[in-house]
Swiss-Prot record:
Family matches, as PANTHER family: GLUTAMYL-TRNA(GLN) AMIDOTRANSFERASE SUBUNIT A, TRANSAMIDASE
The protein's name: Glutamyl-tRNA(Gln) amidotransferase subunit A
UniProt KW keywords: ATP-binding, Ligase, Nucleotide-binding, Protein biosynthesis
GO biological process, one term: translation
Function (record text): Allows the formation of correctly charged Gln-tRNA(Gln) through the transamidation of misacylated Glu-tRNA(Gln) in organisms which lack glutaminyl-tRNA synthetase. The reaction takes place in the presence of glutamine and ATP through an activated gamma-phospho-Glu-tRNA(Gln).
Active site (UniProt): K56, S131, S155
Assembly and binders: Heterotrimer of A, B and C subunits.
Gene that specifies this protein: gatA
Family: Belongs to the amidase family. GatA subfamily.
Catalytic reaction annotation: L-glutamyl-tRNA(Gln) + L-glutamine + ATP + H2O = L-glutaminyl-tRNA(Gln) + L-glutamate + ADP + phosphate + H(+)
GO molecular function, one term: glutaminyl-tRNA synthase (glutamine-hydrolyzing) activity
Amino acid sequence: MITLKEALKYSKEELENLKKELNEKAKKEKKIGAYIEQFLDKDLSVSGEGVPVAIKDNISVKGWELTSASKILQGYIAPYDASVIVNLKANGFSPFGRCNMDEFAMGSSTASSYYGKTLNPLNFERVPGGSSGGSAAAVAGGLALASLGSDTGGSVRQPAAFCGCVGFKPSYGRVSRYGLASYSSSLDQIGVLTQNVEDAAILYDAIAGYDKMDSTSANIEFIKTAPNLNVNKKLKIAVIENYVNDADSEVKNALLKTIDMLKANGHEIVYKNLLDSKFDIAAYYIIATAEASANLSRYDGVRYGKRSENIQNLKEMYVNTRSEGFGEEVKRRILLGTFVLSSGYYDAYYIKAQKARAFIKAKYEEILQDCDLIFMPVTPTTAFKFDTQKSPMQTYLEDVYTISVNLAGLGGISVPVAKDKEELNISAQLICKAYDEQTLLDGALSLEQMIKH
């Protein structure tokens, strides 16, 4: 598969041929289910001319159906382009194909999609991760040059690690959320999934920057990263020792070898510990579900998507539309979020979670005052099997090493570093200071080239 960098040199005719090839390949590889069009026996959606980039089903593209992989949004056609789509088109890219996802981005396996599950291209018995599993599977399976996803608690980095591609989540506010169907507004961030680190920098440069349409957009200077990539920069990297040691043995051993290679390549390694991850999980799921319960209240049968036909009055319209339209995991999170915001529990849960979030952020900032980057696992294990019986809590633990990065609002990237004995991918995660994506991408490029050579 050609890279984004190479495709940007293509003529208009060559790009049209490339899109035809990708469309045919998507039809042949239908069982992977990376694209929603593969479930519906349709050609891949296309908008504008340029280098094709696949788009997660929660990012608005004018004229395309936007469903967040949910029954409740069936038939909703986006009336405008999200800011990232406007930026993509302005930089020579073309939205091409709707990627499958966990319903409303709630999940770690892309098995909660209304359309059906996406398979991991490395092993069809394994999950591709989530919630941007379709975006990762499309890139890893050679069905897309690159894709856009969203990351609320690891939803770009974790599927990238499971499928074996690069997944990059910029700092909160660096990329506009205008036109992204919200899950948790203070945690959501649009990110990129690519074949390599340089492509991640190129695609990030195309979508990043201040946007007056997004009140949470960071109004600070943005300097393009791809032209300034420096693979030779020597960095001080903090290894989170307790997280590396707690990972599965194969993941741990692969990361320890990677750390030795970083040392051998002239990077300074120091060892630090972060808080017990149980605090991250508790704070994250209280804040994320609280915000989700508010954000998803807009899907009521009046304004968007499908309305239940089994209604006699207004109350039945609300109850039946939401009961029929939302999947089990979404209902679970709405209930949890409503509970933690209720008057008797608001102080006990939500306020405490916000205090814990501030504490987690301060801990990261303390480490990054003295170091350029943080190094730790992306996931505790490699991709698990679809038939693995996991409770909701066990599923939530899949994001144990990624959620705190969102709580702190920092940038993070997942880079493939090894394979396990079953040829499943193992990735390392690098984390930077807020808005220091240049250093993050420099470090990731250095790591990638080190592994390849």
